[in-house]
Amino acid sequence: MLANVVSRKASGLRQTPARATVAVKSVSGRRTTAAEPQTAAPVAAEDVFAYTKNLPGVTAPFEGVFDPAGFLATASIKDVRRWRESEITHGRVAMLAALGFVVGEQLQDFPLFFNWDGRVSGPAIYHFQQIGQGFWEPLLIAIGVAESYRVAVGWATPTGTGFNSLKDDYEPGDLGFDPLGLKPTDPEELKVMQTKELNNGRLAMIAIAAFVAQELVEQTEIFEHLALRFEKEAILELDDIERDLGLPVTPLPDNLKSL
């Protein structure tokens, strides 16, 4: 009988989870103990990699997870979701910026720019200071409204554990804005379309950086630079033909020599 009681007591002790205690002193000086709060176990690295590998945007030639800087080694799924939201947003802004560069340089006299005292001219990197204030004010308000809507739809209340994190039921990038009804209902088709958007956004981020660098170095507009490159290549090809025929070579204009 006594053995059975001892056995049950020992079994109960084994099933009770251990809790760490911290010895503290009360105001009266007596020594007491308080239980330490239990912390959640960190998400395993394998879970983060598996989650990332199944996201839209994994594409050739990088069929696996492309993470040369090793960000995922110390990241959580919450971090990955926030980074994906940032990538989608920056890609969309870059696509608009790349389009705005080339269109803005072709519509330099368009009255929407509120530049009544003179014309907007030159590379797009110098248009900011030439365009009237009446254009930037409504644009700033529109950006503020759009960003406020994005925060309201996707971001958690910044208190407690919700600081700097997305809502649990929010799909990064999905703001519910689909006026043309192009969003596929099939999950696989949706993933393909999301991958296309990500790839176009990634290309646009590289393109807008190249646009800015090219205009800073050569001080020419995008299409003007492209036309000059074609002109130079045409002259060089013509020179090769003239050499083969024993004809005088067409000289390369000075403005094309530096291209």
UniProtKB/Swiss-Prot annotation:
**What does induction of this protein depend on?**
Induced by sulfur deprivation. Induced by high light stress (at protein level).
The GO molecular function terms of this record are: chlorophyll binding; metal ion binding
What cystine linkages occur within this chain? none
Summarize where chlorophyll a 4 binds, as residue positions.
200
Family, according to the entry, reads as follows:
Belongs to the light-harvesting chlorophyll a/b-binding (LHC) protein family.
Q: How does it assemble?
A: Interacts with the photosystem II-light-harvesting complex II (PSII-LHCII) supercomplex to form PSII-LHCII-LHCSR3 supercomplex.
Function per UniProt: Required for non-photochemical quenching (NPQ), a mechanism that converts and dissipates the harmful excess absorbed light energy into heat and protect the photosynthetic apparatus from photo-oxidative damage. NPQ includes dissipating excess light energy to heat (qE) and the reversible coupling of LHCII to photosystems (state transitions or qT), which are considered separate NPQ mechanisms. Is responsible for most of the excess light energy to heat dissipation (qE), also known as energy-dependent chlorophyll fluorescence quenching activity of chlorophyll excited states.
Q: What is this protein called?
A: Light-harvesting complex stress-related protein 3.2, chloroplastic
Say which species the protein is native to.
Chlamydomonas reinhardtii
